[in-house]
């Protein structure tokens, strides 16, 4: 597959309701001109879809997977168990425990099955996209340059004094 056809990042989530958080990943990746795809894949309700996605991700041109999940949040860990690609887990804020259940589920992986765990909710989704950009930037100087420009712009936007 040629470099231009690589999707590079796959954003997956357990349900449609998770999209309101995971859209923040898309927004950052768009700003950085990183190709991505977005899918709904439930570890519990669509296990065959999850399995096929995970075992074929690398063959399909994916470099990094960002997986958002709420509640028991098994999606990132199950995907990580099936691929050696980097998997970044975004805990989705839930009504019952405010996402703490998701955070603990994603963070407490057994040794040998790593998931890079981010913060709960919007901040985690944004940072997952930035971390994916950092990973891709290791081998893609264009992405690295865009990421450095993004961070410089972020720094410049901070006022030196309060108004």
Residue ranges and their predicted role:
Residues 4-45:
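Glycine-rich phosphate/diphosphate-binding loop of Rossmann-like nucleotide-binding domains
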Residues 55-98:
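Helix-adjacent hinge/juxtasegments
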Residues 16, 41-43, 70-71, 92-95, ...:
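Short, ordered loop/turn segments at secondary-structure junctions
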Residues 38-60:
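N-terminal beta-loop-helix "entrance" segment that forms/cooperates
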Residues 18-22, 47-50, 69-78, 97-100, ...:
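Short glycine/serine/threonine-rich phosphate/pyrophosphate-binding segments
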Residues 25-31, 55, 82-84, 133-134:
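Short, solvent-exposed amphipathic alpha-helical segments in soluble enzyme
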Residues 7, 13-20, 24, 99-163:
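C-terminal binding/interaction regions
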Residues 8-13, 37-39, 65-67, 88, ...:
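Short glycine-rich or small-residue beta-strand-to-loop segments that form or flank ligand, phosphate
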